[in-house]
Amino acid sequence: MKCFLRINRMALGETRTHTKFIVIVNILLGFGCLLLSLEKSYIDLLHADWMIFGYLLFAVGGIIGTMAVIGVFRDLNSIQYSDVQMSLPMSSAQRYFSKLLALFYLHIFPVLFWGGLTVVIKTIEKHNSEVYRFFWTTGDWDFFWYESVDWFRLYLCFAASVLFLDAVGVLCAVCCGRRAETGYFSYIAAYCLSVLPGLIRNRLLQTWGGQTMEAGHAFFVWTWSFWAKTYTDFPTYLLLINCGISIALMVLMYFVYRRRDAGTAGRPVSNRVFFEGVMFAAVLTMLSLNGSRYGILLTITGIAYLVIHIITFREQLSCRKIAVWLGKYAVTVLLVFLLNFAAYMTNGFGAVYYIPSESLDGAHVVVTTNRTTGSAVFYAGSGLAIYNERMEAYDGYVAPISMSDELKRDAIRIVQRHLAAQEKSFTDFFQRLGLIETEENWRHDLVNITVFQTKTGPDQEVMTQSLFLPYHEINAMAEELEDSGLVRAMEDLWYDSYAHQFHR
Amino acid sequence: MIEIANVTMEFRNKGVGGDGSTLTALRDISVTIPDGCVYGFLGSNGAGKSTLMRLLCGVYRLQKGTIKVDGRDVWNNASVKSEMFFVNDETVQYADFTLEGLRKYYRSYYETFSDEVFYRLAKQLQLPLNRKMSSFSKGMKRQAVVIVGLASMTKYLVLDEAFDGLDPAMRKMVKDIITDEMLDRGATLILSSHNIAEINELCDRALLIHKGELVFDGEIDKIRSCACKVQLMRKDSAITREELEKTGVDILKYSTMGSVAQVIVRGAGDEIMQKISAVPNDVCELIPLTLEEVFIYELEARGYGHEVLSEN
């Protein structure tokens, strides 16, 4: 307790030196709270559309947290501040944690306070509305509670976002030695960390696994705080874990901070591993954005890579240095390609075997083709069938006859095996990577397979997975399925009554 | 007491933005600073004075050697640092503070901080309490930081070029205030300055560093007497350097003007006179050196600013 009080006293001492920031952040968040709270309630001028400005002010209030981080950790950016702060009677642990506490007072607390106030006002306002009064009087507590929880989730999103940004800011502040680098590396790192898991999922697992996977929440647990609100099924507990990871990162960065002294103050980046890590993540992010315009992406990323090196190194430019940096970029791109190639060869690091990604219960696989000559496989919750283009008129699902889980798995394993058994070639790799895209070599023979999930999306829509197989592989798969007795020949299907298509 | 033993400090300019070079800022420095003294750090620009001060105050992490303050390590030691106050050679970091804000800031770190001393000294130096320090002159900023340092009531006060920017009258006043406040309570003052006269006047001990190496350290009087100037005259021909060196004296500088030879010799006066008397001469005169002359001749002997110093 005595130790905390001492750290708190130091944190308050640090906080007092950032009065301008305190005023600015509270003005932003205060007005954000006002706009969100008064929306369509008391003032006619504040139409619902104004709410976006409330969110915007909150977003700006959150983003400028990086400024607070830079200010609080200024002892790492300037030898003058190092002289003052590192000679003060504090151990490195006391200094670091007093800084974290100062960051809490400066930025995290205002976001939590104004966000909390907004949630309280909105909840009270909603509970006073006619609709709420109706449910209140009818005793429909579920509805009453649901809306309150929704605002609580929004509050947790504020908290998760601000903690995420500040944690990334602290990471960069501890690894950088100048204000500018701490600033722009914070935003680069925050962006990469936010989108990279999704891009890795899309590019490395989904594309090369030959399927679309259901959004795995655990996969995005830390970095999806910004988008969590848009996914109503993003569990609240994951938001709490999200906050926990950010706090843990801030605490763990102490072990890097304690190794630093004033000697590294003023160096653009004090930790080479950090610099190369961020640069690799940035290149990977950029090259995973859109596979169909790889040439443009390579050029834009290369220019950005070079510019960041010029800014960061602050050296006199020479042709040799630029050549070295371009060489480094080429190696980084090669690594990204190798990573993609590894994913291609392993079918998305084995992601192909997660079809369907959710439970088999009620899952059904539909294989269709828009080629007139194509045949197709239909796998329903209780069976599989092959049909051809003539069956496009067929709508709805056939009432399935019960099929055991074991048989479902057998059928799915055959689908997985054929997906994994696709012929590998560099041409195919580069084509699917997006480096080659011409009419001549476009894969005309790919057949789309759609796996319908039992699980429904945020708007109760049916969740699907899209798989692609070459035509000849589809035929082989259909034959194997038929041979195994899991499906019947399409001629039989066409003439059989629907009710008996999916026997067994 | 501060014991510095075999301290070596290297700056490796590695990593992002570094050119890979290594600069040895301090090489095998060993010094003892007794309690209650006023200790002066002398040295040329870039000699390593500020680096040594930063090591003393735990701003830099020690690489080789040891620094013990009352038997304890400084680095990462809050209790040792609570007995030290460091004023560096810049004031830009205080620009956003008011003097009152600076008081509150340091008060939250130093439990021994005395408001009474702070307000008394601020009044004495007529410094405005609620004006931003960015509007202060350089001298006023210096005074403000020194006041805070004194009010922190630490056992050790470390001042790096603390009197820079002060006019002569204010310089004297601040020096008087520092010596009164510090010596009254038996505290130790460590200061660096390029102004040797100032060190000569204020300090009872000093050290000289050049290019990271310790040239000498000890009591000022002893330093002054560790070298002296000898003027020799011989009517028929000037005494040559070789003749003098044969006597075994350590010559820092030798010059002639007609039949008069002037030599700066390292060592005690009596001993030097005894050795030099072996050389035939008509007149031999021993002239004590000032600290400034010792400083100049020692650095000159090491090739520092040779051309400039020779011209002067």
Where are these regions (language model features)?
Chain B
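ABC transporter nucleotide-binding domains
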Residues: 2, 9-204, 208-210
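ABC transporter nucleotide-binding domain
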Residues: 174-267
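A structural detector for beta-sheet-dominated domains
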Residues: 5, 12, 34, 65, ...
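C-terminal coupling/interaction segments
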Residues: 259-312
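Alpha-helix N-cap/helix-start and coil->helix boundary motif
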Residues: 74, 100, 196, 237-238, ...
